[in-house]
From Swiss-Prot:
<feature type="repeat" description="LRR 6">
    <location>
        <begin position="237"/>
        <end position="261"/>
    </location>
</feature>
<feature type="repeat" description="LRR 4">
    <location>
        <begin position="186"/>
        <end position="211"/>
    </location>
</feature>
<feature type="repeat" description="LRR 7">
    <location>
        <begin position="266"/>
        <end position="291"/>
    </location>
</feature>
<comment type="function">
    <text>Substrate-recognition component of the SCF (SKP1-CUL1-F-box protein)-type E3 ubiquitin ligase complex. Mediates the polyubiquitination and proteasomal degradation of CAMK1 leading to disruption of cyclin D1/CDK4 complex assembly which results in G1 cell cycle arrest in lung epithelia.</text>
</comment>
<dbReference type="InterPro" id="IPR036047">
    <property type="entry name" value="F-box-like_dom_sf"/>
</dbReference>
<protein>
    <recommendedName>
        <fullName>F-box/LRR-repeat protein 12</fullName>
    </recommendedName>
</protein>
<feature type="repeat" description="LRR 5">
    <location>
        <begin position="212"/>
        <end position="236"/>
    </location>
</feature>
<comment type="pathway">
    <text>Protein modification; protein ubiquitination.</text>
</comment>
<dbReference type="GO" id="GO:0016567">
    <property type="term" value="P:protein ubiquitination"/>
</dbReference>
<feature type="repeat" description="LRR 2">
    <location>
        <begin position="86"/>
        <end position="111"/>
    </location>
</feature>
<dbReference type="Pfam" id="PF12937">
    <property type="entry name" value="F-box-like"/>
</dbReference>
<feature type="domain" description="F-box">
    <location>
        <begin position="1"/>
        <end position="47"/>
    </location>
</feature>
<keyword id="KW-0677">Repeat</keyword>
<comment type="subunit">
    <text>Interacts with SKP1 and CUL1.</text>
</comment>
<keyword id="KW-0833">Ubl conjugation pathway</keyword>
<feature type="repeat" description="LRR 1">
    <location>
        <begin position="51"/>
        <end position="78"/>
    </location>
</feature>
<feature type="repeat" description="LRR 3">
    <location>
        <begin position="161"/>
        <end position="185"/>
    </location>
</feature>
């Protein structure tokens, strides 16, 4: 019977990659060969530190000993709900990430207090920045700040960031490389603020507006006015009507449209009305309807038959992927 000793290094590395960071370091003590494998650059491309209460001293050790130039994606948590005496993410740590991890492209911060961490301290190599349940200051994304900050940033995800408001949205215009914006539960953003923000972010190619207080109709109206080159739209159907959906008709570059439930709006367009609007979108290749309760129903048959050039996906809301770096 085969044992671990019989497995090739490539298989062992694949197995080790599924281990939490703490266990990964522990197995390096098993033998010299495993220690060498744990030091492999491939194993430290994507690191998830949200599973632990990570003290700054430990974080600094990991940064110096294991991550450095190997790191491509980092997911880490803060101590937002742990009291005033809990250690917080610091500007010094963010600057060290930028200096010691020149290949870091994606940074995901969870439950972190960033009020005292200026955006200027974040690694300038970032292409994707995700904030999940984080606290930011009013000045964090102020429009008048240094326009050279994060020059490569292409995607920003703002998920349940309660302080995020219209002024922050307008401050995103400094990121000239930005192509993808995700707003999740950002309840302080108003319809007027979204319209003004998108007017200056007219180079966006992907926009997601999920679980916000904005109606789907007002969101689509702002998109149709300002984002003529948008390729992917994903939004919650709250407040969606057939006239609201019709403003997307003729969108020249739209390739993917995703509408998410739950179905709570009485004005929700019928499958026939959705079909009529989609037929006017020349480049539409993906239509996705999630959580509307239409899976296996007549609606799915109507849309699939009427859009033979499209991939029509009708399904329940999926569970969140554990592959956070994808």
């Amino acid at each position: 019977m085969a044992t671990f000793a019989d497995l090739p290094d490539s298989v062992l590395l694949e197995i080790f990659s599924y281990l939490p960071v703490r266990d990964r370091i522990r197995i390096s003590r098993v033998c010299h060969h495993w220690k060498k494998l744990v030091d492999d650059r491939w194993l430290w491309r994507h690191v998830d530190l949200t599973l632990y209460t990570m003290r700054p001293k430990v974080m600094w050790h990991l940064l110096r000993r294991y991550m450095a130039s190997r790191l491509h994606s980092l997911r880490m948590g803060g101590y937002l709900f742990s009291g005033s005496q809990a250690p917080q993410l610091s500007p010094a740590l963010m600057r060290a990430l930028g200096q010691k991890c020149p290949n870091l492209k994606r940074l995901c911060l969870h439950v972190a207090n960033l009020s005292m961490v200026p955006i200027t301290s974040l690694p300038c190599t970032l292409r994707t920045l995700e904030l999940h349940s984080c606290e930011i200051s009013m000045a964090w994304l102020h429009k008048e700040q240094d326009p050279t900050v994060l020059p490569l940033l292409e995607c920003i995800v703002l998920d349940r960031v309660p302080a995020f408001r219209d002024e922050h949205l307008q401050g995103l215009t400094r990121f000239r490389a930005l192509r993808s914006l995700v707003l999740g539960g950002t309840y302080r953003v108003t319809e007027t603020g979204l319209d003004m923000g998108l007017q200056e972010l007219n180079y966006l190619q992907r926009l997601e507006v999920l679980g916000c207080t904005l109606s789907a109709d007002s969101t689509l109206l702002a998109i149709s006015r300002h984002l003529r080159d948008v390729r992917k739209i994903r939004l919650t159907v709250r407040g969606l009507s057939a006239p609201g959906l019709s403003v997307l008709e003729g969108m020249p570059a739209l390739e993917s449209l995703c509408l998410l439930g739950p179905l709570v709006t009485p004005e929700m367009p019928s499958p026939q009305e959705i079909l009529a609007s989609c037929l006017t979108m020349p480049k539409l290749r993906v239509l996705e309807l999630q959580g509307l309760g239409w899976e296996g129903q007549e609606a799915e048959r109507i849309l699939s038959k009427g859009l033979p050039h499209c991939m029509v996906i009708v399904r329940a809301l999926p569970k969140e992927s554990m592959d956070w770096w994808m």
